[in-house]
Amino acid sequence: MIFSQVTLQVEKTVKKKNGAEDNVIKPITLPAVKQRISQSRLDEFSMIGLGKNVRYELNGIGEMEDLIFNYFLDEKGETFKRTTWERNPKNNKMILEGLVSNGI
């Protein structure tokens, strides 16, 4: 287990004084435990396995379970695209998986 933190980039819509709407990214930092992912071998027909995948386990997030976001940052500031955000029924913790957002 590697104790770490992740910063979720939650996009919210804010109304301006003139009535216009603007999307604002609100960072939410949460404690997490980084899990190891074994990279699968390359398939001869596809390039699956080349990207950098990460998996985090978050505990006790409460009402933040229903957050809608597409990107998150790790403790080093590297941006990841969210691929999985679901509750693990075995231990009641949230699983967050992502792929490096700037490519391979």
UniProtKB/Swiss-Prot annotation:
Keywords: Viral capsid assembly, Viral genome ejection through host cell envelope, Viral long flexible tail ejection system, Viral penetration into host cytoplasm, Viral release from host cell, Virion, Virus entry into host cell. Disulfide bonds: none annotated. One of its GO terms (cellular component) is virion component. It comes from the Viruses. One of its GO terms (biological process) is symbiont genome ejection through host cell envelope, long flexible tail mechanism. It is found in: Virion. The keyword Ion transport does not apply. Probable head completion protein that exhibits an open central channel for viral DNA ejection. Part of the head-tail connector by binding to the portal protein and to the head completion protein 2. Plays a role in morphogenesis of the virion capsid after genome packaging. Belongs to the skunalikevirus head completion protein 1 family. This is Probable head completion protein 1.
